[in-house]
């Protein structure tokens, strides 16, 4: 697993306009990076221009595209010479990669190492977009605003080792958006505001009213 340096993370949050972001532990900074990446990836998810170019097509066509790409590998889907080439998916991947490189320049040196993982992740996101666009509003994405009080019905904490003792019940970062389905909800994943910051055993108490 490749990880960014502390300086790269700090630069990332400065560029994103979030220099005051607080993490309870140093390794929690990865959740901040995930939050910023996902914000770019899911931007305009519910719009017809999600691929970077506006398109207005019948919902049945989108459903057929969903079925087709579900049966195609992400690598084959972006290869113009391949039988199952998907021009819209290819355009979507290029558009999101350009956004990420513009906002997170340190990712450029990783692009070839992460390309296959990136494409596979984008395939799942694109499939979700196609399904949502063809569902007549049955499937929709929802986001949780920062400083919102934690609500367990529609949110879950992203860190599997989360300890309520060290956090306020207040959302600091939306890491992964949630989805409303017809009869259920996929919860949004959030990172809460820490009370205590522990970097290399140096404890700093953080209180916010």
Segments from the language model and where they lie:
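Internal, charge-rich low-complexity segments
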Residues: 1-120, 124, 128-143, 149
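Compact beta-sheet-dominated globular domain cores
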Residues: 115-116, 121-128, 141-209
């Amino acid at each position: 697993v490749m990880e960014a340096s502390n300086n790269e993370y700090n630069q990332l949050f400065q560029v994103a306009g979030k220099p005051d972001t607080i993490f309870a532990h140093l390794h929690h900074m990865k959740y901040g990076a995930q939050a910023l990446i996902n914000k770019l990836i899911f931007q305009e998810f519910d719009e017809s221009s999600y691929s970077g170019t506006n398109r207005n097509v019948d919902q049945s066509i989108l459903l057929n595209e969903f079925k087709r790409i579900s049966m195609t590998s992400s690598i084959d889907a972006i290869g113009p010479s391949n039988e199952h080439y998907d021009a819209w998916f290819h355009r979507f991947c290029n558009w999101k990669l350009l956004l990420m490189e513009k906002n997170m320049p340190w990712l450029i040196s990783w692009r070839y190492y992460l390309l296959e993982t990136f494409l596979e992740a984008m395939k799942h996101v694109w499939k979700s977009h196609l399904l949502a666009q063809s569902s007549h509003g049955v499937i929709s994405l929802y986001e949780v605003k920062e400083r919102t009080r934690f609500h367990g019905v529609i949110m879950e904490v992203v860190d599997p080792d989360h300890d309520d003792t060290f956090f306020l019940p207040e959302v600091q970062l939306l890491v992964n958006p949630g989805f409303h389905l017809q009869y259920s909800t996929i919860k949004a994943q959030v990172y809460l505001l820490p009370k205590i910051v522990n970097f290399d055993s140096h404890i700093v108490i953080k209180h916010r009213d």
